[in-house]
Amino acid sequence: TKKSIYEWFNNTKSNYQHKDFYKIYIDFPKNELLNRIHSRAREMIKKGAVLEVKKFNSLKVRNDKTASKAIGITEVNEYLLKKIEIDQVIEKISIKTRQYAKRQSTWARGNMQNWNKKNPIQLKNFLKKF
């Protein structure tokens, strides 16, 4: 469509009224989110991220393509080039993911003001009512 998601969202007409929806934004407590991010980075490495990046590299995708900019690719490539250790890969992936989560949170705060913000426990209790 060559339109940004923002343009598409704002210009697409819905068959539903806003009152037909109960909008929920899942907001993890910061310390829980940080722990989940770090655990996820460790799990990615444990489950074969290095091999996956090697396979990706064999596809010869240009560095300016979006896929080459995914979190983890640059960090694992630094490891493959022996510039950093595997623990540093995990830390760098965690940092970039935290930065991405912060951008998402900032965006949500400005664009989802009328949504119902719930932490996972509140959401679980809310959904039990249905």
Model-based region annotation:
Residues 1-16:
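Inter-lobe coupling linker of SF2 helicases/translocases
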Residues 13-130:
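Catalytic core of IPPT-family isopentenyl/dimethylallyl transferases
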